[in-house]
Curated annotation (Swiss-Prot):
Subunit (UniProt): Homohexamers, covalently linked. Interacts with OPG144 and OPG153.
A single cellular component GO annotation: viral envelope
Protein localization: Virion
GO biological process, one term: fusion of virus membrane with host plasma membrane
Protein's name in the database: Protein OPG154
Species per Swiss-Prot/TrEMBL record: Vaccinia virus (strain Western Reserve) (VACV)
Record family assignment: Belongs to the orthopoxvirus OPG154 protein family.
Entry keywords, A to Z: Coiled coil, Disulfide bond, Host-virus interaction, Phosphoprotein, Virion
Source superkingdom: Viruses
Function comment: Structural protein involved in the envelopment of mature virion (MV) to form the wrapped virion (WV). The wrapping consists of the addition of Golgi membranes to the mature virion. Participates in mature virion (MV) movement within the infected cell. May play an indirect role in MV-cell fusion.
Coiled coil: 36-101
Gene field: OPG154
Xref: InterPro entries: Chordopox_Fusion/A27 (IPR003436)
Amino acid sequence: MDGTLFPGDDDLAIPATEFFSTKAAKKPEAKREAIVKADEDDNEETLKQRLTNLEKKITNVTTKFEQIEKCCKRNDEVLFRLENHAETLRAAMISLAKKIDVQTGRRPYE
């Protein structure tokens, strides 16, 4: 570790084969036929139910995005009003400070 700039620089690279396998497991022929048969059993009702569920989820997501958009727009309007209000208060405080300075004699009347 003497020649390393950061801790861990001297570590060896981990081979990718430790994380995943590049070969698919071979399935027995008997199970393969059962899987194909199960896939054929999907009738139109289950497909319609899947499509209906998917449509509900998409509708729900679009509704949430619309609500987020409205909320962001409302927050933008409120922020704009607050910024204008802060600027108005700043200008009023400066004029009040000038008025107090004139009345106390610290500054001549302009």
